């Protein structure tokens, strides 16, 4: 017993000693300053060499580090823009003062996007661009998101101030389905749209640490959508970037009062982050932007055909009765006067009016004038009630001796529309809120919860101009990560708010005071009556424009004028009534749920670097019938995928080979494999050639699959899944191509020819795919001169587009020639199709960064993209200038805290093709500039800046607003 007690006592003492030994920790404190300027360096990394322990300097450059290692220990200090430094600490009571030596950052930035693992940007196996925290801080653009537009290979499409869409390597547009945008690893797309809504949801400006851009194919690692690029936006860690920061930015736009009076611009941002202990930190942030948006003012005339509408040169409301203004809405309602007259005649005959038409034929054959025929009708009690139809019946009479046949010709007329400024909400704002909780479970495992919420009012250009009023989106993520693995789950919650369409709301207002049928009857009847001499005092020898003006004036009698109570009431009713109920409002509450994991086995597999990952997501579509065919309930779409990447360095690390492959599956489509192979060849220190073969794809978007949306002009967009062909019974009730219907109606000017009608074929959609080959070089020709060059060749297959068709409202195929003669008895449909023709594209880019003198940085890049061997008549929506370039010069500290930055961009003209309209977008150049002053003692910066400094208006795409100058001053506290 005594022996056992003695053993127990020994073991207990040993355990106490062991615990005490482990409890012996050392706390080290210090400060880091820039050795050149004496300024404190915040967010510098401090780690204990050979240990996982580490911390970051706070906003005053101070740090406190606790370690269980015995003294002496070696601290490793690192930060972008400084040389890595090691300091030995022998005494814990010693305050460590580090004088950090600045170094050139050219080519030394660490990027993750290229391979999902950290590497120097010089050693990336594929093309990549990076925007650093310092570049964001010193950019003249008012938003960090706009700074992307100065990168090599990037185009920006501006639908409105807060809705800008970056694109690379072609296929520009408002909302890019071939471009991924990830914020802290979360796909930033709106679930109902399948593309990112600009920067309406995402990081506040003071919470952005960096942005990384992969131009070109990136599906091998990032999945569907990465056909033309992937953008990664990374936030600041609350462990690394601490303290209170705020920025107040105010300015003006519309200074020349070209579109409206001078308007104020406000942008207020705040961020607070705190490390409460070595294990726990948090951050919160908010940003509010308010501005009077750029306005859509293009009044050029469109020739509309439901899918690709083109411009009519010189057309105006005054000289074109069928005028359809680009940024004018409500004039999409159009009808052929001849077809309308024929419809009136057919209705009369169906009601037993053969004696009436027979009498007219007889009078015309007898040589009576229209006035004489009217007198005959007035004197005959049996014919008198039908006198009102004479303007329709005389021009459509089949009498052999009818000099008035063809009076209407092939002329169509449209209703009088409303300018965009009366229909779209230009009171743009964007409120972003963010919060994050980070907890270190161990020295190597971090748990985090992040939430980003955004709401705002903006405008988006798709098949229509959509007023995104009070749009709301939230993204919420749980993540566990370590050095070599992560697990994350997140959701995107979308709420369309009070969003609505401009065209549908304008049509609603017009129809509120007079139906389309009544309006066209008044117009056609008045026009014909005037031309036939049936209106007293109106001669028949006047120019045709006079008769059209007379007809429009008569038809527009009682029209609601903008600003009147009648207009406002009708407009409000349109905005507050769901599209599915005949209004213009969206009612979307679609969500996305995503799960993802990644594991790096490089430490376990010694002979090759191994990376693998998998993901799964679910779309939950819920638009209450305002976008999707979901009136019966929510629609679920599941996707899952997995990827594998292998990397191997050979020949004394002069050659690095990377191979990756990904497989993805969507519920509605066959699985897709996307391999990628690349080689990085070191030809000298910090000089590398890269070669790559990449593949990419995109599944048809949620709208491509399930849309069922009634748009302007009674046109319905439908999805491309087989269920739509079944629901709409295309097999038993065929639809006809839009162009054949146009040709058929035009034949009514002489002899109607139903043989012109061509049946359209509904085919099931397939995913798009592409293959790309690239060669590039990136290297330092000196420590102060970085060059990057690339050339690529790509081949695209199974382009997704739309085909316009129509069919009779009666549902009886035998009546198709009768129904299709009039727009009032025709249902217009547009369904998704794949192009059978592959398309080839080539492109190149060249850029350099040159530290010419002290801190002066000169940058320049030029790039071009174009399609090859495009068959005549194929619509590609490529929408890309053949050539563009960027020039920049800046210095953040010219003298005593003063700095500046100037950027100039020029791009070639574009032959734009879009569902909203098609036409030439002129070439333009724009100058952005800013002057800054650092208040170093309080780590603050004052900026005076301007974008489009010369205020020369330009347009980035067809139908979008012209962008003028924005001038601002800002003050930022604790921003460097």
Model-assigned labels for residue ranges:
Residues 22-109:
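Periplasm-facing N-terminal accessory domains of Gram-negative outer-membrane beta-barrel systems
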Residues 29, 45-62, 109-139, 164-165, ...:
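N-terminal periplasmic "start-of-domain" segments of outer-membrane beta-barrel proteins
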Residues 63-66, 188-215:
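Short acidic/polar hinge/loop motifs at secondary-structure boundaries
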Residues 66, 128, 145-190, 209-210:
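Extracytoplasmic beta-strand/coil segments of soluble accessory domains associated
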Residues 95-99, 144-147, 164-168, 179-182, ...:
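N-terminal periplasmic accessory domains that precede
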Residues 206-209, 220-232, 237-302, 428-431:
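Outer-membrane beta-barrel translocator/receptor signature
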Residues 273-279, 285-291, 428, 474-476, ...:
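Conserved C-terminal beta-signal and adjacent last beta-strands/turns
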Residues 650, 786-912, 972-974:
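Gram-negative outer-membrane beta-barrel transporters
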